[in-house]
Every structure is written in C-alpha cells, then in structure tokens.
C-alpha cells in the first residue's frame, strides 16, 4: 500500500520532468532511483512488470549499448572510496591497494568519508563527465574499464 502511494506521488513528478523531453542529469536520475549505469535495454523490461509509466524517465536516464562502446578517452578520473568501508568491497580494495592505479594516467584515488565506491570520469576542463557506481565490480572489471576510458602510462 505504501509503495502504491509513493508511486502515485512519484508519477506526476516523473511526468513533469518528462515534459522537458531531454536527457536528465545524472543527479536527477539518481534522485529518481535510476542507476548511473542504466542500460536502455533494461527500460524495455518495465512493461513486463506493469511499470510502463516509468518508461519515459527511464529512457531519459539510460545509456545506449552502442554509446557505451565508444572509445572516447578521458583525460582523468577519480575513484572515490571510503577508507573505513573499503573492507566491505574486497575487489575494489584489492585494486586500490595494488600497483594497478599507477598504470593509468590521470587516475586519482580519493578517500571520501562514507562514500561507496564511485568512479568519476573527467572531461578536458576537469568537470565530471560520467559517474559510475562500482560497488559490485571485480578488480579485473575496474582495470578493463579504465583501460578503455583512460590512457595507460
């Protein structure tokens, strides 16, 4: 019952945002409960769960698979983690504490109190271009992703 009330409250908000017709910012998508690495193919599954009303905002927050395959190199990245929570993410911990971060030009490890593991890719001006949660990534996935997105030393 509470979920239905929440959904009824959320729908007008989503419809209002959808009226703008453009992609939503990563912050707006996160506030709506969408992951920063949401694939558009996931939006196609909403109908199976009678969630068609979420289709439009989902499509405004998703990334096309082909778009993900672009080989754009970023000049830098920040991997944010909380030192006290790092033990809960052993794969990320293994990457951070190894010599692997030194292999990537422009990669900074930043310890932010309370932060779950997040990877922020920076544009030429040092602004955040993409932000990805890496909670469930293993060491090889982090290294492979950074190999595709950053220049190796």
From Swiss-Prot:
Subcellular localization? Endoplasmic reticulum lumen
Q: Which domain of life is it from?
A: Eukaryota
What InterPro entries does this protein map onto?
Sep15/SelM_sf, Sep15_SelM, Sep15_SelM_dom, Thioredoxin-like_sf
- For the keyword Endoplasmic reticulum, the answer is yes
Alphabetical GO CC annotations of the entry are: endoplasmic reticulum lumen
Keyword annotations for this protein?
A: Endoplasmic reticulum, Selenocysteine, Signal
| GO terms, molecular function | oxidoreductase activity; selenium binding
Provide the free-text tissue specificity comment from this protein's UniProt record.
Higher levels in polster, prechordal plate, axis, otic vesicle and somites. Lower levels in fin buds.
The residues forming the signal peptide are: 1-19
Q: What is its main location?
A: endoplasmic reticulum
The entry's function note states: May be involved in redox reactions associated with the formation of disulfide bonds. May contribute to the quality control of protein folding in the endoplasmic reticulum.
The text of the family note is: Belongs to the selenoprotein M/F family.
PANTHER family on file = SELENOPROTEIN F
Protein name, as recorded = Selenoprotein F
């Amino acid at each position: 019952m509470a979920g239905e009330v929440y959904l009824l409250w959320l729908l007008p908000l989503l419809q209002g945002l959808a009226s703008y017709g453009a992609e939503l910012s990563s912050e707006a998508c996160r506030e709506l409960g969408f992951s920063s690495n949401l694939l558009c193919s996931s939006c196609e599954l909403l109908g199976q769960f009678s969630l068609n009303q979420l289709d439009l905002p989902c499509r405004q927050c998703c990334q096309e698979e082909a778009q993900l395959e672009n080989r754009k190199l970023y000049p830098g990245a920040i991997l944010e983690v909380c030192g006290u929570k790092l033990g809960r993410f052993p794969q990320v911990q293994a990457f951070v504490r190894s010599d692997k971060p030194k292999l990537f030009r422009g990669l900074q490890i930043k310890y932010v109190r309370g932060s779950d593991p997040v990877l922020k890719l920076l544009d030429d001006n040092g602004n955040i271009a993409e932000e990805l949660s890496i909670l469930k990534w293993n060491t090889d996935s982090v290294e492979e992703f950074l190999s595709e997105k950053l220049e190796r030393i």
